[in-house]
Amino acid sequence: MLILTRRVGETLMIGDEVTVTVLGVKGNQVRIGVNAPKEVSVHREEIYQRIQSEKSGTPSEGGNF
């Protein structure tokens, strides 16, 4: 895992087309902005896991299946 330190307003690049910018920090929360091509899916981890479990037919925690 690559660990980086960024300040508000600073950006990191993932490949040539994806940027992640730190928009703000408030307490233990960090607001980030992700700029990626339309064909690149960007999800929060818990949403991604739900999508994957729905694809495989495995109920997710708290799901109503």
Swiss-Prot record:
SUPFAM superfamilies: CsrA-like. The keyword Cytoplasm applies. GO terms for cellular component: cytosol. One of its GO terms (biological process) is positive regulation of translational initiation. It comes from the Bacteria. Gene3D superfamilies: Translational regulator CsrA (2.60.40.4380). Its main location: cytoplasm. It is found in: Cytoplasm. Keywords: Activator, Cytoplasm, Repressor, RNA-binding, Translation regulation. GO terms for molecular function: mRNA 5'-UTR binding. Belongs to the CsrA/RsmA family. A key translational regulator that binds mRNA to regulate translation initiation and/or mRNA stability. Mediates global changes in gene expression, shifting from rapid growth to stress survival by linking envelope stress, the stringent response and the catabolite repression systems. Usually binds in the 5'-UTR; binding at or near the Shine-Dalgarno sequence prevents ribosome-binding, repressing translation, binding elsewhere in the 5'-UTR can activate translation and/or stabilize the mRNA. Its function is antagonized by small RNA(s). Homodimer; the beta-strands of each monomer intercalate to form a hydrophobic core, while the alpha-helices form wings that extend away from the core. PANTHER family: CARBON STORAGE REGULATOR (PTHR34984:SF1). This is Translational regulator CsrA.
